[in-house]
Amino acid sequence: MDVGELLSYQPNRGTKRPRDDEEEELKTRRKQTGPRERGRYREDEATAAEDADDDKKRLLQIIDRDGEEEEEEEEPLDESSVKKMILTFEKRSYKNQELRIKFPDNPEKFMESELDLNDIIQEMHVVATMPDLYHLLVELSAVQSLLGLLGHDNTDVSIAVVDLLQELTDIDTLHESEEGAEVLIDALVDGQVVALLVQNLERLDESVREEADGVHNTLAIVENMAEFRPEMCTEAAQQGLLQWLLKRLKAKMPFDANKLYCSEVLAILLQDNDENRELLGELDGIDVLLQQLSVFKRHNPSTAEEQEMMENLFDALCSCLMLSSNRERFLKGEGLQLMNLMLREKKISRSSALKVLDHAMIGPEGADNCHKFVDILGLRTIFPLFMKSPRKIKKVGTTEKEHEEHVCSILASLLRNLRGQQRTRLLNKFTENDSEKVDRLMELHFKYLGAMQVADKKIEGEKHDIVRRGEIIDNDMEDEFYLRRLDAGLFILQHICYIMAEICNANVPQIRQRVHQILNMRGSSIKIVRHIIKEYAENIGDGRSPEFRETEQKRILGLLENF
């Protein structure tokens, strides 16, 4: 085996499936050697067997000899061999660059150097097995050279670099050597890797299989880096990635794995990041998300992958609505009308649309959306969902508890924010049909009160055991217990009790009498409701200004005076 064969040898890394055309070729070969074909040569079978044995022996001798030569030639992967590999890479990169400058209009002159360059890039994949040696890639400026090649005139070379970077930044590999990973990620960030990747993305043609793979691997690099260093998401978005993702999502192309991946990376960039949420709003991203989701108002996703993309887009929208400026964009983009239509159509998108409405209306920033929701007859949509949880929600991955949480949160937001005629229309709903909605509210109250009492009993037992062991229950433990109680049902119970307090303060005697009547019938007490609301007020407004928190607490506690 000569040196050229060794250099061009590429081990099967097992990361990609065989392509469709390769599979077809394999099938064709199998067909060509089927029983009928073999039958034609039965007369020569004995002779062929003898020849085959001789050929087999000769082949085994050649393999053994080549194997011995390879063992002698092959160096173990250590610092020295990596340095040698990087040096070869730099030489080939420089030679290719030199020939391209010298013979810009004569590809034959530089094509061989390009193939050599591609070969050494493939060989460098072996470095991904030794993250402890990543520092050599930085110290010997290989990272800088690789980033430079992302702009290579030949997209085959830039795609090869993307493939290599994807493997070097594999999240499992990065965690094998934190020190090596930090050095590599620092160098990539300093070299503005995302900006260069986006420039390369702009010229890739996804109708070409290799270039579509290049897009997928580019997104994988971003995901890997974001998982290892979440703070780089802001810089990545500002370097053109967010704009490219939005453009790719709205491109008129059939749904594929790359569109799914784009939705996933978009959701990652927006997670807990107000700067990126604001940037998305400025780029008209709210409209893009609403346009993409509008497809699912009357049609369910056709595959599990398409459903996953839909959920990613809903998550991205919910994340954006955490920012008040995006609530206004959502309102102007007729997001409320779209979500209301989805609730009525009863498709898979309904559960996620409910979650979006919850995010759009919550807090004082949701006041405009609350008023508009009543104007578009949203009360006719939300109250049937309040009266009865849909049976099919389990099929779309939403629990009955999650559904009831969102509905009660929306009603609480409406009661908090509505004024004038819209508020009157809302309160009238609680008096319709012999106050059936008050009855349903009380039914939910006792349902989640029971769940809370079970959870509280368990937590009290745990606290007793801790004290008995002589340990102290610190603030962190108390916070953990409170979060457990919220998850067990306290969160929705607080909203239910808040709704009770609001409607009992509405100067509608019929509602107040019905609430007290049901509490007495069930042997419950107004004191329990008061206690839950006080606890709710004490914990409200986390992450907001002290002024808002104080004002909101006074307002909520004021409701108890006339309860």
Curated annotation (Swiss-Prot):
InterPro entries registered for this protein in UniProt: ARM-like (IPR011989), ARM-type_fold (IPR016024), CTNNBL1 (IPR039678), CTNNBL1_N (IPR013180)
Modified residues (Phosphoserine): S389, S545
Modified residues (N-acetylmethionine): M1
Domain notes from UniProt: The surface residues of the concave side of the superhelical ARM repeat region contribute to, but are not essential for NLS binding.
ARM repeat residues: 178-228, 229-273, 274-323, 325-363, 364-417
Key words, A-Z: Acetylation, Adaptive immunity, Coiled coil, Immunity, mRNA processing, mRNA splicing, Nucleus, Phosphoprotein, Repeat, Spliceosome
Compartments (UniProt record): Nucleus
Main location: nucleus
Gene name of the record: Ctnnbl1
One MF annotation (Gene Ontology) recorded for this entry: enzyme binding
Assigned GO CC terms: nucleus; Prp19 complex; spliceosomal complex
Keyword Nucleus: yes
Protein name: Beta-catenin-like protein 1
Protein purpose: Component of the PRP19-CDC5L complex that forms an integral part of the spliceosome and is required for activating pre-mRNA splicing. Participates in AID/AICDA-mediated somatic hypermutation (SHM) and class-switch recombination (CSR), 2 processes resulting in the production of high-affinity, mutated isotype-switched antibodies.
Annotated segments matching region Disordered: 1-81
Motif (Nuclear localization signal): 16-33
Annotated coiled-coil segments of the chain: 476-540
Residue numbers covered by motif Nuclear export signal (NES): 130-140
Entry-linked Pfam families: CTNNBL
SUBUNIT field: Component of the PRP19-CDC5L splicing complex composed of a core complex comprising a homotetramer of PRPF19, CDC5L, PLRG1 and BCAS2, and at least three less stably associated proteins CTNNBL1, CWC15 and HSPA8. Interacts directly with CWC15 and CDC5L in the complex. Interacts with AICDA; the interaction is important for the antibody diversification activity of AICDA. Interacts with PRPF31 (via its NLS). Interacts (via its N-terminal NLS) with KPNA1 and KPNA2.
Modified residues (N6-acetyllysine): K91
SUPFAM superfamilies linked: ARM repeat
Compositional bias ranges of the Basic and acidic residues kind: 34-45
HEAT repeat intervals: 79-129, 134-176
Record-level GO BP terms: adaptive immune response; mRNA processing; positive regulation of apoptotic process; RNA splicing; somatic diversification of immunoglobulins
